[in-house]
Amino acid sequence: MTKQLSTVRTDQFETKTQFVDAVELYLFDKKLRLLVMDALERIEIGLRVDIAYLLGQRNTFAHLDATALHPTFAGKVDKRSGKTTFDIWQDKYKGLLDRSKEDFVKHYREKHGPHLPLWVAVEIWDFGAISQLLAMMKVADQQQIASKYGVNDWKVFKSWVRSLSYLRNLSAHHSRLWNRNMTDQPGLPTHKGDIDWCDDFIGKADLIARPFLLLSIARHMIKVVCPRTEWHLRVQQHLQQFPLQHSNRKLSIADMGAPAGWEGWWIK
């Protein structure tokens, strides 16, 4: 799902803008990216466990076997390369395997052969590999994992994981985050009330296109992975310290896509 907001940028500075305004926004954004990476690391580990446990019960090498996945999702042919989605994922996995410097990879391959079982292979996957494999899984399997996170629609959950992978790439590559127009936008429940906090975003393209929605998804998922986490409280504290500007145009976390009254559900 991608939507572009119409924005007008000029080379003119807002009246009374000072250099310190740009510096403080940069520092705010830098800390925000660090907070995001902290959450996504734990969510990534949780998803690895979810996939390894579910698929590994039935097939030790499910990640190497297209028949363990949804035939349509895994068998879709990319027009540009002529390869199936599964084959493209295999290429990615082999690249991660070849680049891995982990001792356990070398040890296992020397002792047991070239193919890592699923519960070992997951340790070298990045967020993108996790997202792509999840998207190839059978509907019942995707829904089982989605349900663990309180999401009733597997398609919505799949889009959440994909968008968090995008968020992870932005944060890891030091891209500006706080007011970015997000080109990979997650889906939301069709009906209000399915996930209470989502109600503030449903049908609001201007909010869906901003990063606060992805922060909210990260909050939702990390509270499942780490029930006693205080990550969301640290994020709230950081957001409430949004830097004041000297310029006539006053920026705020509303420019991040934060809906009115977000604090009410964020701390729960």
Residue ranges, per PLM feature:
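Long, contiguous internal "core" modules enriched in hydrophobic/ aromatic residues
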Residues: 1-268
